[in-house]
């Protein structure tokens, strides 16, 4: 991103990010989402990324993502207030947002999903790197997750992931549920008319990921195969799993989350512990 805001120092950015995070540090679930007075550089980052992503989505995003995004109609020309988007999303699919100061622990995050609540940050990525961030930010949470949560199918899948996490007790089982979430709802790809299209939130909210994802090593979507693949959120994904249709995603992933428990996941993992870093 060119312009004066691209020269913002790391120290100034961290101060601003901390200011926004502090607004939600002590919020109770029933408290209203804070209103953030966004600065011009934040609006500039939002506009720059959204304009470029919208163009890329026409060729690279799955049809169901595009339809859902059109329904939610997140503004492209300014940073929206999270509480406004939350209200609109709630009227569409029943999901709402809860403001979070940063990435929340996986069990807490999934607990929200079970109750149709998505924890979202309210700060934006550094203006020096607007097209990719390894940390979740408002762009990732709204353009990536918010847009698909306006789809009834995706809203069901997110709830199923949350309910699955609530059923399990072992760390290994919880982490594996998180891994399935990562390779589908974060980094999922589907074939449409012979072309690979992205539907995962990490892919559709990152120009860099959309540039890179078709060069990945693609494997058929299979829950057992996921157990043997690790991931690193700090880089573009070298391995992705693709489905032949969104119905296959719903059948494969939805059925797993709907029925899994500690024992079935332990059997799937072969009794061994595999450590992953949840996003």
From Swiss-Prot:
MF-aspect GO terms: iron ion binding; oxidoreductase activity, acting on paired donors, with incorporation or reduction of molecular oxygen, reduced pteridine as one donor, and incorporation of one atom of oxygen
Result when mutating residue 187 to F: Loss of hydroxylase activity. Only a small amount of 3-hydroxy-L-phenylalanine (meta-Tyr) is formed
Pfam families linked to this entry: Biopterin_H (PF00351)
Residues given in the record as Fe cation binding sites: 140, 145, 186
Reported impact of residue 202 to G: 60-fold increase in the preference for 4-hydroxy-L-phenylalanine (para-Tyr) over 3-hydroxy-L-phenylalanine (meta-Tyr) formation. Only a small amount of 3-hydroxy-L-phenylalanine (meta-Tyr) is formed
Site label Important for the regiospecific hydroxylation of the phenyl ring, positions: 187, 202
Cofactor(s) it depends on: Fe(2+)
GO biological process: L-phenylalanine catabolic process
Database matches in SUPFAM superfamilies: Aromatic aminoacid monoxygenases, catalytic and oligomerization domains (SSF56534)
Highest taxon in the source lineage: Bacteria
Disulfide pairings: none
Enzyme Commission number: 1.14.16.7
Keyword vocabulary terms for this entry: Iron, Metal-binding, Monooxygenase, Oxidoreductase, Phenylalanine catabolism
Catalyzed reaction equations: (6R)-L-erythro-5,6,7,8-tetrahydrobiopterin + L-phenylalanine + O2 = 3-hydroxy-L-phenylalanine + (4aS,6R)-4a-hydroxy-L-erythro-5,6,7,8-tetrahydrobiopterin
Task performed by this protein: Tetrahydrobiopterin (BH4) seems to be the physiological pterin, however the hydroxylase is also able to use 6-methyltetrahydropterin (6-MePH4).
NCBIfam families associated with the record: PRK11913.1-2 (NF008877)
UniProt-recorded name of the protein: Phenylalanine 3-hydroxylase
Organism: Streptomyces coeruleorubidus
């Amino acid at each position: 991103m060119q312009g004066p805001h691209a020269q913002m120092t790391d120290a100034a950015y961290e101060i601003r990010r901390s200011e926004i995070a502090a607004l939600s540090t002590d919020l109770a679930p029933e408290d209203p989402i804070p209103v953030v007075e966004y600065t011009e550089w934040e609006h500039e980052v939002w506009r720059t990324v959204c304009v470029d992503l919208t163009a890329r989505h026409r060729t690279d995003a799955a049809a169901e993502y595009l339809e859902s995004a059109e329904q939610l109609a997140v503004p492209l020309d300014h940073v929206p207030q999270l509480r406004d988007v939350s209200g609109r999303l709630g009227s569409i699919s029943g999901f709402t947002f809860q403001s979070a100061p940063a990435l929340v622990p996986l069990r807490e995050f999934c607990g929200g999903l079970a109750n149709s609540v998505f924890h979202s940050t309210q700060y934006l990525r550094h203006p020096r790197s607007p097209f990719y961030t390894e940390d979740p930010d408002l762009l990732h949470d709204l353009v990536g997750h918010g847009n698909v949560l306006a789809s009834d199918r995706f809203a069901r899948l997110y709830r199923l992931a949350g309910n699955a996490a609530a059923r399990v007790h072992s760390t290994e089982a919880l982490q594996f549920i998180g891994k399935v979430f990562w390779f589908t709802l974060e980094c999922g790809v589907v074939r449409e008319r012979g072309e690979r299209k992205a539907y995962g939130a990490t892919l559709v909210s990152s120009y860099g990921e959309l540039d890179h994802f078709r060069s990945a090593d693609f494997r058929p979507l299979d829950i057992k195969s996921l157990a043997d693949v690790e991931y690193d959120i700090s880089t573009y994904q070298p391995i992705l799993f693709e489905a032949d249709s969104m119905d296959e995603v719903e059948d494969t992933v939805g059925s797993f989350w709907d029925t899994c428990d500690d024992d079935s996941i332990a059997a799937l993992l072969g009794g061994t512990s595999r450590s992953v870093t949840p996003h």
